[in-house]
Design a protein with these regions (language model features):
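Acidic (Asp/Glu) and glycine-rich low-complexity loops/linkers
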Residues: 2-123, 129-141, 150-159, 168, ...
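Residue-level signal for short, function-critical loop segments
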Residues: 125, 144, 182
């Protein structure tokens, strides 16, 4: 019996070494465990993003369609509604035997330089970076992810439990709110602006 156990231990060690060598010989490849996508959608005034740990970057651009580009453990799904786009993670379950380069994971949402009514982004642990998007309202909520907004020109509501917030106003919008329970919050106002904080 002991010989049988030793034989299985040797076989397991050889297979583990073979998998490690394969992962080393193919650097940067996820060996089928990551999902990638690059999709285009018509303009919508209402945009909602609901993800777990995927970082979200919103980039304004000169195109005429909304573009979603991503690399993630599970595929992202997009659902078009009445003047709305909802992006979420699919219910597909993925188990990976290999360590992935998670720093290259994330979702990039390219928004045409138009006016939007409402943009809502929710992540559990992903970071959110917002470019100078023009929207009536932008709401971003994370549990532990950081929120960075550059050249903000929209009414915004940013909330995180333990992440950090950097809000850089292009012009101050009355009624904007920032809340971070245990993280840091930094607000940059335009020169010459008059601001009252509550």
């Amino acid at each position: 019996m002991e010989r049988g156990i030793n034989r299985w231990l040797i076989i397991t060690a050889v297979l583990a070494a073979a998998f490690a060598a394969l992962a080393f010989l193919i650097p940067g490849e996820s060996l089928g465990s990551s999902k990638e996508g690059d999709e285009y959608f018509p303009l919508c005034e209402y945009i909602s993003v609901d993800l777990l740990k995927t970082d979200v970057t919103v980039i304004p651009y000169e195109g005429d369609r909304i573009r979603m580009k991503y690399r993630n453990d599970v595929p992202l799904t997009a659902e078009l509604g009445d003047n709305s786009l909802t992006i979420s993670e699919s219910g597909e379950f993925v188990v990976s035997l290999f360590a992935n380069e998670h720093e290259s994971y994330g979702m990039y949402l390219y928004l045409p330089r138009e006016y939007y009514r409402d943009i809502l982004i929710y992540t559990v642990s992903g970071d959110v970076t917002l470019g100078d998007v023009d929207s009536e309202k932008i709401t971003t909520v994370t549990n532990s992810g950081d929120i960075t907004s550059e050249n903000t020109r929209s009414l915004c509501s940013f909330s995180t439990a333990s992440g950090n917030i950097l809000l850089d106003f292009y012009s101050v919008i009355t009624g904007s709110a920032v809340q971070s329970r245990t993280g840091n919050a930094e607000i940059v106002f335009p020169k010459g602006s008059s601001v009252a904080l509550d």
